[in-house]
Amino acid sequence: MLKSFTLAAIFCGAFMFAGAQTLTMPPEIQNAFDKGTRSTKGKPGKKYWQNHARYDISVSMAPPNRTITGVEAITYFNNSPDTLRSLNMKLIVNVHRGRTPTAANAPLGIKVDDIKINGDKAVWDNDKAVTTNQMVDLKSPLMPHDSLKMNIAWHYDLAGGQGRDGAIDSTSFYLAYFYPRVSVYDDYKGWDTQPHTGGLEFYNDFCDYKLSVTVPKNFIVWATGTLQNPNEVLQPEFAKRLQASMTSDETIHIATAQDLAAKNITAQNATNTWKWNSTNISDVALGVSNHYDWDAASVIVDDKTQRRTAIQAAFADSSNDFHEYVKFAHNTLDWFSHNLPGVPYPFPKTTSFQGFADMEYPMMVNDSHTKDLTFAQLVQDHEIAHTYFPFYMGTNESYYAFMDEGWATTFELLIGTAENGKAKADEFYKQFRVNRWTHGPHAKEQPIITPSPDVTFGGGNNAYGKPSLSYLALKDMLGDDLFKKALHTYMNNWNSKHPIPWDYFNSMKRGSGKNLDWFFYNWFFTPYYIDLSLDNVEKTSGGYNLALKNIGGFAVPFDAIITYADGSTETIHQTPIVWKKDQKNISVKIKTDKEVKSVTVDGGIFVDADMKNNTWPVVAAAK
């Protein structure tokens, strides 16, 4: 009840100041700006800080046995000005215990076998550590700008593979969020204690990882990071193919179904330990199989340095779509690196692993099989787009989902246009991202800025379609070049950090050189929707005036499609800037000496909730 009241107060205050277009912020956010960790200029404040850690993780398994055993050493650095007397540990695997994790029949989660902090045994009770957060008290406080070392041994039984992690089949496993980790401690919320219940996603610090995965012979491992010992775990021919793929634009079949049947791809030790390294990244994930095909190639993502990113795919031989995944990803990385966001793909690799989740991880994608190749490519495009948001930008997915899903949805449309043409991409975007929202009920609509855990209606709309439309509306208003300049300002300011919505707003204003408060207020701080009405078309001495009413409220672009009496047509585009002075009623002037026969207002992908009032003269409804 207190949470609802607080949100209501925030939004009530926002509406009270609507005339001034104030971008209201909660007290804890305002406090971060006041303390100097955030800046109204868009960049991190002079006193900005963030914590990080080094993880050295060793995992072992022996499929089809689903028991996963791990040990890890963590060096955690407290860069904050605060003295930490406890650490909050994230145990995401416990999400599989369900909504009643303490019930006697609840599935088992992760079990910590031993935990030491700075060499001393820490207090840990597995019977209490059943949720996705567990606070650990420190015997000695962790002082500002100091570090500590943790050693943890743990095990758990892998769940079924229908979600973001689990057993895909009896000998194909996907491990994600599989290790205890220190949660984010930041400058505006302190410890991130947001429970993970399976719906919302994640928020992690940028850390360095060493990952060792021990599996029986003939099992291949794919993981976040760069493989350190290919010549130890692969037979020479397959190590040679892998190395060749690092400079090849064409797909190289590292391991085919025939190769797998021969059972001579890996070193023939009883077990092999695959070792991976990655730096300044927010998480690691891995896939394991003894019967998945392995394709690979690479692509130049940075023309200045000629840096290449490795592209790999792991999949069942019967999945025709995955045979195309390396080729698809080659196009994806090339397009994203050179168009929008127009930032070279920031990591050394991407791998698509066949599973069930259609889910992104740093350098990894867990995608389901589909017979529709166009849809398969679109899904992979969307998941790889998440490389930038959140994995490059470090946003809080669990609290501000629109800061990553909205961008991935936007890039999905833009690259889809390049791949399939504007008409097909627009139609998919409307059907998959917009129509259900815009034609649905709006009485319970909540502003996009609403923290994701507090969205009680239309959470998917607030995370995907609505924010994506806001980004596209801004692109339409600023124009491609200025929009890209502003976006790069935001990304340059905040990559590898932890931006919040107000950092985005301030960076985009700074990068564009324009005061966009009115636009951001309209799109993010109101419960608006899309519904324009063409109320009147009036002849004037120089042409015509179109009188439009913005019933829904969002500042959207639109086309005025004019049909003249002589049969000719003209389309006049209006960007969202037309709504800056008056967001409810505007007049659009049409200069012409021709007689207008009819006018239709069409928003394209900005789908109108009620098209019946978008045409003049008004067409009588059929009886």
Regions found by a protein language model. Give the residues of each.
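Early extracytoplasmic/domain-onset interaction patches
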Residues: T24-N88
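A surface-exposed beta-strand-loop module
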Residues: P26, T67, F77, A104-T171, ...
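Hydrophobic alpha-helical and helix-loop surface patches within well-folded domains
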Residues: M25-T40, A53, W276, I311-A547
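Glycine/proline-rich low-complexity spacer/linker segments in large multi-domain proteins
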Residues: R99-A106, H155-Y209, N229-P230, I605-K623
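Hydrophobic helix-coil surface modules that form long, contiguous segments used
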Residues: D186, E201-D381, T410
